Amino acid sequence: MEAILDKIFVEEAVSELHTLQDMIRWTVSRFNAANLFYGQGTDNAWDEAVQLILPTLYLPIDVPPHVLSSRLTSSERLRVVERVIKRINDRTPVAYLTNKAWFCGLEFFVDSRVLVPRSPIGELIQNRFEPWLTEEPTRIMDLCTGSGCIAIACANAFPEAEVDAIDISVDALNVAEQNIQDHGLEQQVFPIRSDLFRDLPQEQYDLIVTNPPYVDQEDMDSLPSEFRHEPELGLAAGSDGLKLARRILANAPLYLKENGILVCEVGNSMVHMMEQYPHIPFTWLEFENGGHGVFLLTREQLIDCAADFALYKD
């Protein structure tokens, strides 16, 4: 039955939808009817449709309004419809269908080797981590870099800083390296393979920013289908989601300068962090554009709570 419906959708769409606006409207309707799950770069059917259709047609994501009335060829309509059906039937993330994602206003190549960029840390980068950074940073570490989006966004925000982009996954580092080259930042952003801090020389940074795996087992068991296309290595973090965060907290002070700060995302696992370590003075950051579960600690605060995480030190 599904194959028959797909054939009907394809024939109907290719024959009756003529303009870009028609295609967007039809796609939004199909997405709404399919009860898709969003959250991988968009939070609604309209933005999801736009981010699927425009790259599929090799158009920029910010096309002027008059382009919406442009007519599409039958081959263009067919290409879009095939991707819409794949998004619905397979629950494949749009970014994996187009190999494009956006973060901090920058475009990135992505595929199933990395998570789709979506961290609220982007808002902090655009605000240059004010008021937390007291001096212009010269060394920044992006730990668990994935696609390299945070490292590259930091390099754009702080053009005088060197940025080390760390990940354990060779696949992820290959994607990050492609993005570094695409943005012309080979002399500023440096991909490095390491299991968190374990394989790194002990150098000091003004800022360590990290979006590590933090999904607890309960949430892993109930992940929407869309998120199951993403690499589990970038999501799962043990029963309480803090497996990697504890190691980061244990080792970060050794890699921070005197006035350095750690910014770490733990998402929904912030509940476990607050329950297990109520005495630690986490600064839980707030976001105007949505998001939660990101804390900040200074080097001094990390040193003060070192005993809590001594067991997890490399």
UniProtKB/Swiss-Prot annotation:
The keyword Signal does not apply. InterPro entries: DNA_methylase_N6_adenine_CS, HemK-like, Ribosome_uL3_MTase, SAM-dependent_MTases_sf, Small_mtfrase_dom. Keywords: Methyltransferase, S-adenosyl-L-methionine, Transferase. One of its GO terms (molecular function) is nucleic acid binding. Its EC number is 2.1.1.298. Signal peptide: none annotated. It holds the Pfam family MTS. GO terms for biological process: methylation. Gene3D superfamilies: DNA helicase RuvA subunit, C-terminal domain, Vaccinia Virus protein VP39. Transmembrane segments: none annotated. GO terms for cellular component: cytosol. It catalyses: L-glutaminyl-[ribosomal protein uL3] + S-adenosyl-L-methionine = N(5)-methyl-L-glutaminyl-[ribosomal protein uL3] + S-adenosyl-L-homocysteine + H(+). CDD domains: AdoMet_MTases. Methylates large ribosomal subunit protein uL3 on a specific glutamine residue. Belongs to the protein N5-glutamine methyltransferase family. PrmB subfamily. This is Ribosomal protein uL3 glutamine methyltransferase. It comes from Vibrio cholerae serotype O1 (strain ATCC 39315 / El Tor Inaba N16961). The lineage of its organism: Bacteria, Pseudomonadati, Pseudomonadota, Gammaproteobacteria, Vibrionales. The gene is prmB.
